[in-house]
């Protein structure tokens, strides 16, 4: 948004016009409101971003464009941001502006052509042609590619045009006849870097990278697929790409190469290909269905010869599994898998899917040491060399004693297939890495909060190992927050610090954390000496506090956490690494960095808080200690002394060494093999059990409570001593596999007193473990307990919560607040990016003395399915519903639910549990027990883990799809040949669709599940990919395919039932009381007598209490109130009529007693009941509304009758409106096929019933009766219809005939003269309320039903087919 010159809008504001002719808005003064106006940068649908124009609200409205709601939302958002700026602090505004600037930089890249993928000559409307290029834009998916004018593209991006031309004319495309695919050449060592490697020879391989390249080439020549397992940071990506480029240039093997990499490293792989192998045509096969369709159409092969265009495909695991049928149809010269440790489970779908690919060579790349068992190592070896490592049992038998006798035999067998090297071994120029643990004391406020948290959770802690592990974890997390900073435990309002001077605010921040006090001294000294620093923390809110501190200290910094996305992240990294950058610090989230981040320009790493898993901290250190680093890397790990944090670090080091890493060295290469798992039952995210957590919580707690509470002096530290020790050089671990231990140089700094950590641990080991009663003093416990009781009593008398407070409680989804007592201490506050519950929740759940609160049960009490999270279970259940006989299609379910890495055995176990519980719940609800006697037994749901599952819905889905499994062949080859052998109704799609397409659709559903239309479209074997999901405007789309599939499934189920001799169960109907034709009550014959009607099918008109039976109300009545009002009005009418009405029976009553209601008549078929549906679907209602728009006046006349007309005229007018409305309905229904006519006739009459007190059945019956009488009048009157007297006489006769059709009418025959009739009607009208519109309408309704007036003559030729002769 901007303020621009008035009228400077439209095409003259595009970037290419401005570059050629200058900016017409130049010199504009935004403050001059008279000559300027608000303008908005508009992205036009179907046009690329280079065609964006600045528009004002007036120009947009003048063009009458669609999508104005987007502009309204944008303006609304700008107003909200403007209001927020007035309330927010300067730090928040600065951060927002930084993010906005980075976002604008990202948007600018949308104007750059990344790749031209096609060209065409488009015919112009006025004659001639226009040459165009199909352009893929930078940072945007292929789906956003657009056709652009060739002149414009050639002028702005001539290099991309040249690259496109060279790709189109290239002869270096894949061929199956390449000789080296069948016979590998003899190996020749490469002693110098080839000239073609590295763009313009500006990139050079290091010695160890040349060795790695030679090893890869040697393995390929020996026909050995291999695993490259170098440590992170040694350039595995570069070595791999250079290997492919060697095959391309030296062996003339042009592919195709399939590279499967994580999405997070996709950009890095693209960049490295451009730099190291520029001649390889690499296509990134990612994106949605539309993007992948465009790639297959324009980037995959030449249209003329079907030869492959590309040399290498970059894709992800997820896309590969979605399109595995398509990708598996090609023969790949080389399969490359990055992050290959994801293939460690040989029972996972990902493993099995990739293993089936036809590949000539396989290369696995992993930088993560294998972690758990020898079988995982065998799984990788079996993947690359299935014939060499065929049997796991044999492999295990050969090496079962390796742990005791040594790994020499195993090394000898693995040497040709695995290469693992570490930085300290191969990169001698890489400086040393020195790590120190700096123990710091807590400040006085931290000690106070730490004691509060322990005391407050006393009832949960005293349970010890009997308590909930989740409760212990929550308490540990709260204590870790307190160790970092007091503000994480009890947040203060921002204004309390914003109003302070800078020095006072910094001092207040420092008093809240002993770590921050040490960090302040350390950073000041590091900045003076020219160092650059990386600061890591797990907690996002801690990064916020550090950012505030750095800003107030005026230290320039960058920040990277999970909220900062890919392109913005790249810009922050580039800014920090830029030559001459003034950035001093880089704040990083420990887990958000991911692989591929290079911050080698920094030489100091500060780990503010340690991760549960030391492996994550090692990866954090590697951000600076990697190739390109020229200085010694100093690593400072800050640990709060005598706290849970100190014990966690020590235990995590020991446990990770015992459970995970055993790295063995052989010759000059490192080989990764593993001992069998120690059955500890822990995970990498939480490597501690209950005993560990209980001991961690007790560590240092007793001494903390014994400290002199009056000693509130804040600590002071000697920074010179810290820096002196940091200069000590660490030569690296001497023992193999000792990277995790690192032989830390431990420095302990205490502020009040000096204590040896080893002595403290020795003393603790000698003592018996103390109980929490001995650790927390009794007086402290009593004080906290009294405070909690007092707060509980206050809560009882608190007024209702304000609306904004409720909103705050609801903020963030279902995040749970702390229970009573949490607010005071703030230890239950969430927001650090940790997925935890409040510690007090665990306390409440563990406290047996308190009554159980209603609501969701605690997480610790919920069932947990081993190996699956609730989110994974939810996806599994959703996919489970899509398949017939789902336990036979577990591989397809795993792919659909994105559970490809789960073993099929675990998936089968989960499926069986789901199936068993569904059957159990349905059997329970089918057989009511004594306990459920007297109440409804409608429980149809059950819990699978923490996921609720509707058993009835699940069973219904399985029942719908069950016939598919019995009907279709079991093998895919037979299914592709299989054809439906019965006729189906036309599909009415915009493409040609026949029985063969229906057969392929069912085969696709069998294989990929109901609703997986994208996967079916992708599978070329079904040959319907070009017919379905073509574009948004053409059928069939997903909803049309869903309807067609449901129809076909019903058909095959019906056929199977007939084949098996099953008959469809029908609902029992009441026996008909008479044998008369079903049309008797709809179209009455003129000769019928009142007596006949009284005796046919009529039950006693009295109820059990002797009262008159009230007419039933249609199911379309929206509320019971309407029904009551109708009953009251009807009762008043009956009372007003007196004894004359007691014997009257209405035709609709008789229909309710066994005779069907309105019928649908056709010339060739028997009459069918007109089904009157319930409330219409909103979309159907809107369609009905549009169809009935031509008779809008007639509908209004029904809704608002003219009160000045007499009742006779009112009846006549109503019948005329009904005739007009019915004619319109018949016209609308004619457009539908016979199978849908009945449904739409019901829908439209139901729509009309909303304008009257009549229901749909009554309206349709009256309409058909009017048509019959009009037809009879026309036949009787002949050509004398124009005679007014004759018409009046016919009117008079019709009235008499209608009178004879009154049900059970015992009243005296009315007078034949109109004068007597009008006189009687006037007397009746005096008895009713003339101003009551509904009462008047009720009289009209009664007249219409009794047939006391004949409708006006109408031309009803269109309705002759519905009249029964």
UniProtKB/Swiss-Prot annotation:
GO terms for cellular component: chromatin; nucleus. ATP-dependent chromatin-remodeling factor which functions as substrate recognition component of the transcription regulatory histone acetylation (HAT) complex SAGA. Regulates polymerase II transcription. Also required for efficient transcription by RNA polymerase I, and more specifically the polymerase I transcription termination step. Regulates negatively DNA replication. Not only involved in transcription-related chromatin remodeling, but also required to maintain a specific chromatin configuration across the genome. A motif (DEAH box) lies at residues 338-341. It comes from Bombyx mori. This is Chromodomain-helicase-DNA-binding protein 1. The lineage of its organism: Eukaryota, Metazoa, Ecdysozoa, Arthropoda, Hexapoda. It holds the Pfam family CDH1_2_SANT_HL1. Residues 16-86, 111-176 form the Chromo domain. ATP binds at residues 230-237.
């Amino acid at each position: 948004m901007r303020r621009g010159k008035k009228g400077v809008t439209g095409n003259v504001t595009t970037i290419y016009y401005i570059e050629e002719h200058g900016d017409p808005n130049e010199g504009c003064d935004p403050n001059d409101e008279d000559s300027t106006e608000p303008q908005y940068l508009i992205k036009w649908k179907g046009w690329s971003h280079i065609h964006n124009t600045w528009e004002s609200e007036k120009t947009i409205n003048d063009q009458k464009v669609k999508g104005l709601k987007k502009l309204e939302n944008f303006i609304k958002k700008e107003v909200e941001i403007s209001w927020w700026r007035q309330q927010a602090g300067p730090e928040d505004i600065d951060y927002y502006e930084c993010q906005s600037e980075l976002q604008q930089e990202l948007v600018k890249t949308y104007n750059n052509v990344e790749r031209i993928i096609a060209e065409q000559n488009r015919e112009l409307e006025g004659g001639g042609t226009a040459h165009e290029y199909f352009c893929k834009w930078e940072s945007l998916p292929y789906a956003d590619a657009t056709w652009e004018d060739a002149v414009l593209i050639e002028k702005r991006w001539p290099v991309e045009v040249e690259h496109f031309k060279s790709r189109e004319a290239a002869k270096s495309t894949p061929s199956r006849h390449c000789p080296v695919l069948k016979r590998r050449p003899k190996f020749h060592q490469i002693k110098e870097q080839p000239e073609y490697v590295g763009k313009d020879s500006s990139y050079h391989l290091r010695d160890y990278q040349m060795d790695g390249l030679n090893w890869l080439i040697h393995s390929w020549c020996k026909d050995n697929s291999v695993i490259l397992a170098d440590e992170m940071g040694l350039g595995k990506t570069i070595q791999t790409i250079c290997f492919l480029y060697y095959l391309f240039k030296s062996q003339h093997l042009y592919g195709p190469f399939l590279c499967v990499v994580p999405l997070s490293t996709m950009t890095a792989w693209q960049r490295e290909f451009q730099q190291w192998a520029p001649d390889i045509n690499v296509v990134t096969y990612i994106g949605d269905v539309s993007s992948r369709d465009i790639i297959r159409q324009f980037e995959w092969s030449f249209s003329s010869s079907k030869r492959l265009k590309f040399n290498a495909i970059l894709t992800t695991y997820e896309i590969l599994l979605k399109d595995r049928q398509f990708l598996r149809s090609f023969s790949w010269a080389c399969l490359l898998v990055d992050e290959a440790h994801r293939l460690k489970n040989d029972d996972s779908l990902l493993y099995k899917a990739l293993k089936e690919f036809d590949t000539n060579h396989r290369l696995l790349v992993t930088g993560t040491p294998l972690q758990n068992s020898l079988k995982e190592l065998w799984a990788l070896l079996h993947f690359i060399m299935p014939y060499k490592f065929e049997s796991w049992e044999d492999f295990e038998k050969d090496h079962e004693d390796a742990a005791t006798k040594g790994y020499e035999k195993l090394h000898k067998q693995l040497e040709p297939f695995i290469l693992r090297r570490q930085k300290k071994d191969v990169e001698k120029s890489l400086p040393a890495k020195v790590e120190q643990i700096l123990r710091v004391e807590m400040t006085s406020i931290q000690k106070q909060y730490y004691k509060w948290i322990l005391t407050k959770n006393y009832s949960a802690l005293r349970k010890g190992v009997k308590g909930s592990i989740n409760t212990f974890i929550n308490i540990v997390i709260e204590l870790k927050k307190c160790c970092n900073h007091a503000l994480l435990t009890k947040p203060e309002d921002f204004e309390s610090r914003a109003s302070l001077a800078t020095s006072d605010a910094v001092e207040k921040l420092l008093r809240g954390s002993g770590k921050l006090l040490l960090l302040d001294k350390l950073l000041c000294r590091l900045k003076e000496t020219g160092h650059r620093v990386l600061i890591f923390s797990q907690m996002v809110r801690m990064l916020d506090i550090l950012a505030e501190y750095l800003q107030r200290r005026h230290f320039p910094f960058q920040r990277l956490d999970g909220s900062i996305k890919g392109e913005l992240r790249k810009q922050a990294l580039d800014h920090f690494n830029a030559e001459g950058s003034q950035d001093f610090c880089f704040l990083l989230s420990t887990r958000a960095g991911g692989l591929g981040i290079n911050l080698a320009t920094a030489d100091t790493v500060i780990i503010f808080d340690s991760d549960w898993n030391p492996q994550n901290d090692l990866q954090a250190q590697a951000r600076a200690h990697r190739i390109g680093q020229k200085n010694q890397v100093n690593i400072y790990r800050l640990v709060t002394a005598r706290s849970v944090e100190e014990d966690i670090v020590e235990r995590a080091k020991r446990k990770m060494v015992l459970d995970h890493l055993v790295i063995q060295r052989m010759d000059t290469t490192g080989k990764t093999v593993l001992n069998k798992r120690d059955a500890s039952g822990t995970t990498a995210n939480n490597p501690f059990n209950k005993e560990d957590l209980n001991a961690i919580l007790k560590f240092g707690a007793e001494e903390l409570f014994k400290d002199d509470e009056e000693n509130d002096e804040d600590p002071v530290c000697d920074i010179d001593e810290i820096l002196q020790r940091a200069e000590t050089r660490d030569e690296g671990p001497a023992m193999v596999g000792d990277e995790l231990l690192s032989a830390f140089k431990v420095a302990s700094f205490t502020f009040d007193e000096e204590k040896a950590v080893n002595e403290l641990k020795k003393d603790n080991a000698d003592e018996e473990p103390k109980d929490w009663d001995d650790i927390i003093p009794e007086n402290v416990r009593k004080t906290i307990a009294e405070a909690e009781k007092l707060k509980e009593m206050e809560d009882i008398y608190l007024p209702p919560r304000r609306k904004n407070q409720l909103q705050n409680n609801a903020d963030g989804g279902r995040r749970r607040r702390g229970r009573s007592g949490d607010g005071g201490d703030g230890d239950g506050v969430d927001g650090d990016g940790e997925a935890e519950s409040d510690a007090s929740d665990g306390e409440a759940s563990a406290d047996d003395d308190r009554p159980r609160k209603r609501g969701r049960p605690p997480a610790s009490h919920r069932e947990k399915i081993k190996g699956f999270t609730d989110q994974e279970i939810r996806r599994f259940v959703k996919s489970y519903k899509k398949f017939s006989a789902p336990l036979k299609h577990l591989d397809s379910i795993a792919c659909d639910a994105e559970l490809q890495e789960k073993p099929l055995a675990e998936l089968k176990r989960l499926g069986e549990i789901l199936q068993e519980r569904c059957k159990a719940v349905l059997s329970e609800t089918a057989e009511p027990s004594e306990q459920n006697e007297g109440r409804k037994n409608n429980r149809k749901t059950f819990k699978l883990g923490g996921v609720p599952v509707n058993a009835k819905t699940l069973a219904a889905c399985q029942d719908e799809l069950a016939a598919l499994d019995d009907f279709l062949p079991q093998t895919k080859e037979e299914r592709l040949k299989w054809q439906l052998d019965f006729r189906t109704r036309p599909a009415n799609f915009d493409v040609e669709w026949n029985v063969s397409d229906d057969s392929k659709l069912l085969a696709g559903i069998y294989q990929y599940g109901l609703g997986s239309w994208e996967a079916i479209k992708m599978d070329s074997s079904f040959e319907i990919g070009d017919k379905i999901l073509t574009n948004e405007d053409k059928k069939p789309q997903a909803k049309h395919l869903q309807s067609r599939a449901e129809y076909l499934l019903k058909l095959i189920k019906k056929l199977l039932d007939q084949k098996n001799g099953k008959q469809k169960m029908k609902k029992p109907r009441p026996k008909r009381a008479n044998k008369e034709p079903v049309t008797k009550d709809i179209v009455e014959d003129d000769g019928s007598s009142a007596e006949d009607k009284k005796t046919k099918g009529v039950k006693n008109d009295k109820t059990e209490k002797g009262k008159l039976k009230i007419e039933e109300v249609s199911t379309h009545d929206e509320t019971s109130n309407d029904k009551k009002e109708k009953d009251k009005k009807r009762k008043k009418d009956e009372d007003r009529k007196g004894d004359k009405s007691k014997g009257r029976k209405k035709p609709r009553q008789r229909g309710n007693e066994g005779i069907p209601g309105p019928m649908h008549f056709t010339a060739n078929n028997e009459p069918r009941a007109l089904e009157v549906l319930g409330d219409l679907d909103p979309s159907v209602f809107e369609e009905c509304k549009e169809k009935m728009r031509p008779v809008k006046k007639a509908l209004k006349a029904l809704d608002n009758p003219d009160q000045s007309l007499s009742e006779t005229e009112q009846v006549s007018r109503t019948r005329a409106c009904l005739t007009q409305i019915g004619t319109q309905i018949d016209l609308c229904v004619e457009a539908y096929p016979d199978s849908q006519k009945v449904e739409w006739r019901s829908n439209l009459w139901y729509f009309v019933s909303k304008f009257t007190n009549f229901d749909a059945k009554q309206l349709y019956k009256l309409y058909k009766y009017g048509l019959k009488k009009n037809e009879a009048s026309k036949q009787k009157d002949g050509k004398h219809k124009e005679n007014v007297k004759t018409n009046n006489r016919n009117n008079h006769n019709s009235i008499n005939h209608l009178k004879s059709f009154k049900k059970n009418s015992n009243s005296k025959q009315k007078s034949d003269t109109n004068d007597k009739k009008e006189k009687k009607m006037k007397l009746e009208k005096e008895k009713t309320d003339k101003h009551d519109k509904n009462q008047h309408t009720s009289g009209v309704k009664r007249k219409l039903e009794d047939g006391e007036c004949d409708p006006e003559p109408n031309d009803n030729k269109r309705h002759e087919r519905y009249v029964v002769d």
